[in-house]
Regions:
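Intrinsically disordered, low-complexity acidic/polar segments
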Residues: 16, 64, 90-92
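Terminal, regulation- and interaction-focused segments at domain boundaries
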Residues: 1-27
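Residues that cap or initiate secondary-structure elements
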Residues: 13, 61, 87-89
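Compact, glycine-rich, soluble single-domain proteins
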Residues: 30-32, 36-82
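Beta-strand/loop substructures that line and gate deep hydrophobic ligand-binding cavities in soluble
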Residues: 80-97
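Short glycine-enriched loop/turn motifs at secondary-structure junctions
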Residues: 1-3, 25, 47-50, 86
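Broad hydrophobic/π-residue packing in well-ordered secondary structure
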Residues: 14, 29, 92-96
Length: 97
């Protein structure tokens, strides 16, 4: 069972983040948080890690509807989208399916 959907992009890592943010905006989502895992791991535990960013995306209308139906749904908000670069340089975007 796969719990996510993913796509590989043939663009540099930074461009993949920009394209992902633009695509989210087109679908009514705003990026309300951005976690640079590579930078965080380096600064907190002095570990070198590949480019990996978590974008926290939110569609306020959908979030409001969901919260009216189930108050604990906030545990899954915002919707996380990852942009990561593999060790061989491939860039992938993934989100929960």
């Amino acid at each position: 069972m796969t719990y996510y959907m993913a796509a590989k992009l043939q663009v540099p890592f930074g461009d993949a983040i920009e394209r992902t943010e633009a695509a989210l905006k087109t679908e009514g989502f705003g990026v309300i948080s951005r976690i640079d895992i590579q930078q965080t791991l380096k600064s907190k535990v002095d570990v070198d890690f590949r480019p990996y960013t978590i974008l926290g995306a939110c569609n306020p209308g959908l979030a409001h509807e969901a919260l009216q139906l189930e108050d604990k749904v906030g545990l899954m908000l915002p919707c996380n989208v990852i942009v990561q670069q593999s060790r061989i340089g491939e860039v992938e975007v993934a989100a929960i399916d």
